[in-house]
């Protein structure tokens, strides 16, 4: 099952996201509120036996870490032509700590510069959707280990561990 370490936006941000225009387009699937997360570290397919160790590693890495301010915006971008996402800023240190803590359990196979996004749509993303304005901020007070149990019929993301950021 696919797993990620992520942060979830609060209700006020979810409400704002729900107000965005979502024009129907062939081959484009708009994300639903359950899918509105910002991945701090995508982990890929991970055996369920490794989940407790991952959760413990994230807890240990973030022990003593306080809440973090995040800004999602200012506009949506086409990401590889297959996603429409809005960049998330302010999670770099959190991401570095999580990557370092989890690399011994789930190795980093394709190192890339850290980038976090909130994905609004997947599929064939038309170029004219880039530039959709969105500028929201919130304080992240927990990190979640999320299992993606989605099927072609329905998205299903389940939080399997929650790590509070209490500082």
Label every model-predicted segment.
Residues 1-167:
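Histidine-dependent nucleotide/RNA phosphoesterase domain, centered on the 2H-phosphoesterase fold
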């Amino acid at each position: 099952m696919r797993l990620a370490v992520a942060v979830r936006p609060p209700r006020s941000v979810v409400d704002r996201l729900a107000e965005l225009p979502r024009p129907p387009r062939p081959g484009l699937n708009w994300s639903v509120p359950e899918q509105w997360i910002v991945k701090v570290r995508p982990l890929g397919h991970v055996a369920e036996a490794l989940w407790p160790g991952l959760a413990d590693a994230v807890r240990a890495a973030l022990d003593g870490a306080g809440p973090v301010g995040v800004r999602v915006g200012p506009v949506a971008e086409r990401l590889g032509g297959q996603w429409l996402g809005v960049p998330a800023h302010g999670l770099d240190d959190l991401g570095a700590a999580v990557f370092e803590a989890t690399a011994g359990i789930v190795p980093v196979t394709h190192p890339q510069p850290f980038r976090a996004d909130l994905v609004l749509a997947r599929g064939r993303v038309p170029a004219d959707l880039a530039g959709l304005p969105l500028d929201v901020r919130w304080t992240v007070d927990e990190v979640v280990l999320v299992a993606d149990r989605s099927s072609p019929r329905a998205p299903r993301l389940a939080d399997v561990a929650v790590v509070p950021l209490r500082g």
